[in-house]
Amino acid sequence: MYHVIAATTNPAKINAITLAFDDVYGPGQYRIEGVNVDSGVPLQPIGSTETRIGARQRVKNARQVRPEADFWVGIEAGIEDNMTFAWMVVEHLQARGESRSASLMLPDIILQGIRQGRELGDEMAVLSGISNVKQQGGAIGIFTQGKLTRTSVYHQALLLALVPFHNEIYQRPSPSKPAI
């Protein structure tokens, strides 16, 4: 049984990890443990690079907390231009898989608050009246009226991040480069 460390205690993220590992490895083939670790980036990362660094740093910190585990998974949501998205980072042994989620265009009323230094989740809570939005369906759930959720979008991206660990083509050695 695989020991999977989720570099988060957020239920929406842990649910996405659970769904992805169910799909790839099967229910009952792993156990997930959530740990609270720092991302090393601001609470609201801006830009793809900063967001990806946050996901990678979560994995690095989770590996330090639980080095005996088999997998470590970091998810970091961010804002780039007028879009929200997230980076998924999965490590197993010495290999890494990464994927970026789908993006959602945000309305100006939300972006104004973010430009003033507030987090997307806090802005959504104020405008929607739903407390703790980011641990539920997230902005995605609110704007799509539940057709998509933070969990469902992260699930898809996690499936892509897990590909290097189960697709045999990724295990093949690279062909030698021809001599020039």
Swiss-Prot record:
Its cofactor is Mg(2+); Mn(2+). Substrate binds at residues 8-13, 68-69. One of its GO terms (molecular function) is nucleotide binding. It comes from the Bacteria. InterPro entries: ITPase-like_fam, Non_canon_purine_NTPase, NTPase/PRRC1, YjjX_NTPase. Its EC number is 3.6.1.73. It catalyses: XTP + H2O = XDP + phosphate + H(+); ITP + H2O = IDP + phosphate + H(+). Mg(2+) binds at residues 38, 68. Keywords: Hydrolase, Magnesium, Manganese, Metal-binding, Nucleotide metabolism, Nucleotide-binding. SUPFAM superfamilies: ITPase-like. GO terms for biological process: nucleotide metabolic process; thiamine metabolic process. It is an enzyme of class 3 (hydrolase). Binds 1 divalent metal cation per subunit; can use either Mg(2+) or Mn(2+). Pfam families: NTPase_I-T. Belongs to the YjjX NTPase family. Homodimer. Phosphatase that hydrolyzes non-canonical purine nucleotides such as XTP and ITP to their respective diphosphate derivatives. Probably excludes non-canonical purines from DNA/RNA precursor pool, thus preventing their incorporation into DNA/RNA and avoiding chromosomal lesions. This is Inosine/xanthosine triphosphatase.
